[in-house]
Every structure is written in structure tokens, then in C-alpha cells.
Amino acid sequence: MPLKGEISAQAGREFDTSRLDLRAIIDPRDLRVDPTRLFLETTQQTRLAICISDPHQPDCPVVYVNQAFLDLTGYAREEIVGRNCRFLQGADTDPEQVRKLREGIAAERYTVVDLLNYRKDGIPFWNAVHVGPIYGEDGTLQYFYGSQWDITDIVAERRKAETQRRIAAELRHRTGNIFAVLNAIIGLTSRRERDVSEFADKLSERVSALASAHRMTIMDEPDQEAVAIDDLVTGVMKPYRNRFAERVTTSGPKIELGPRSVTALGLALHELATNAVKYGALSVDAGRVEISWSREDGDVTLVWQEQGGPTVSQEQSEPVKGNGTMLIDGMIASLTGSIERDFAAAGLQAKITLPVHQPE
């Protein structure tokens, strides 16, 4: 699959006539038809889009185009002749490639660039544009020759291949991250568990939470690289909101997070929700949980606030860290984030701060 620069180089090799002396190849006396007629018939029959422009006229307008040029651009001959070829450019045409083309013309140098142009109907097309000078017998510049080789399909295939390579690399990277987290989950979950059944239940819940968070990072579009925090919170808390109805509320602006932050925050929410159901606000009928988030500079802060739950004693306010707590603290710390817990009498408040953008 040729890359962009290779396409230009290939076109340059195929269409560079800088060392071509037609008089040494064709003797007009040997032709059975008029040279002008031969030129017109040849260029009209070729499938390569060709144009000729006149640098002696203001703005170097096009003075000749062949049928392939009309077919490629969708314009009629009278809509092209008399205009500079730049009218084919549009909003997404690369200025750097245009600059390179203009410099080549100014220097009377054979130049090939890959350019995004636009048909009359507005449809963009990629083409390898070749421009070169045509000199008179006295060696002075007379015209510029231009051709356009449609490479739209080539560019599309190249981009498809690049996307597939990027997806494969991202998949390898994320798979490695997932196995690392799984290893930590298994190790920490088994550390203090003596009952196999309880261990299996906790492990299953945490792996399910990991899977739920990971699904959030699988984008619909190849170039999509972030997940809205609102979607993450809604997805993780859906089972609890279905069960506790309006006792779980969420609020906050639209903020997008990278995949690693999504995984850490998703697991943290799962642990907080599980503990709230077992020991906290969601373990009693009057309890409720408020989840809110905000952004300041490059950080996002999520606040988990429990209210109306069981009274928290002094002993409970200084708990020994459990496996889930150590897992979450470790993941958040690895992202240069922080988590603060306040076991106030009114209910637990957990404040999680993470950088919005994380190196993947």
C-alpha cells in the first residue's frame, strides 16, 4: 500500500518530462497527421486529467483541458478555461501542499503534490497533481502543464490500514492494562478471604464492574478517545438506581475522560455503591446518595455524598483498609489522582480527583 509521499514520488517519476526532448524522438516530417491534431486527439483520449495554463496572462489561467479533466472535476470546459486552477481547492485543502505547488511554479520546477480538491457538486477527491513548465525553442517559459491523477481510493485504503493498525495497537495496550487490573483484583480479593463462596462472589462483582467500565471505553468511532463522565456514572450506577429509584441522584457538567481514568473511576464507584448497600446510606430506607462532579483546570473532582444512613461511630470513622479500598486507592494513585474519605456522622463523603487527560 503506497503512502502519501510514495504516491507523489511515483507520479513524479512517471510524469517528469524535464529530460525529454520531443524533437529528438518525433520528427514532424514523419507524422501522418498535423502535430496539433495529434496532440489534441491524444490528450482527449487519455484517461489522465490534463490542463495547460498560460503564465503570460494575469493569474496564469487555464487555456486548455482534456475530456478526462472535465470528467474528474464535473465542470464544463467553458467553466474552467480562463480561471486559475485554485478554484478547485476548498475548506480542507492542505495549505502546506498549496504552498509547495506555488513555490514549484514560481521556480519553474517540476512539482508533484497530493492535494484534496473539490468537484463542481462539492464532493472532495484526492489527486496527485503534477505541474511542469513547457519551454519554447528559444528556452523561454511558454506554458505550464498540469495533470491530476485521482488517488481517492488509494488514500481511503491507506487510511483504513492506518486505522486498523492503530486499533490493533490500542487493543494490545488495553488488554495489557485489563490483565494488570485483574491480577490486582484477584490478589487483593483473596488476601483476607477465608470463605471460598464469599471470595467468588466478591471477585465476580469486581470483575463485572471492571467489564462494565471497560465497555465504556470501547468507542463507536475509531478516532473517539474519551468517555463522558455522565455516561460512566449512569452505566455503573444503573443497577442501584433501578433498585433505589430516586434515592440515588447525579449532577454535573459534560466532562470527558480517557480510558484509564474511566476504569479507575468505574471501579471506585462500584466499591462505594457496594459498601453503601451493605453498610451505608443505601442499607436503610431513609438513606440516599448524591453523586456530583466538576472540573477545575485540568482535574475532574467527583464527590460521593451519603445522607440519612446509619450513624457512623468513632471506630467506623477510622477503618482498617479493606481489599477494595486498597485496590481503588492504588489505581487512583497510579493516575496521579487522589481520594479523600470523610466518615462524618451525617454520612460518608468521598472526594475523588483525577486528571482529565491521562497518557495511555
From Swiss-Prot:
Residues 109-163 form the PAC domain. GO terms for molecular function: ATP binding; photoreceptor activity; protein histidine kinase activity. It catalyses: ATP + protein L-histidine = ADP + protein N-phospho-L-histidine. Residues 38-109 form the PAS domain. Keywords: ATP-binding, Chromophore, Flavoprotein, FMN, Kinase, Nucleotide-binding, Phosphoprotein, Photoreceptor protein, Receptor, Sensory transduction, Transferase, Virulence. FMN binds covalently to cysteine after exposure to blue light and this bond is spontaneously broken in the dark. SUPFAM superfamilies: ATPase domain of HSP90 chaperone/DNA topoisomerase II/histidine kinase (SSF55874), PYP-like sensor domain (PAS domain) (SSF55785). Pfam families: HATPase_c_2 (PF13581), HWE_HK (PF07536), PAS_9 (PF13426). It is an enzyme of class 2 (transferase). This is Blue-light-activated histidine kinase 1. It comes from Erythrobacter litoralis (strain HTCC2594).
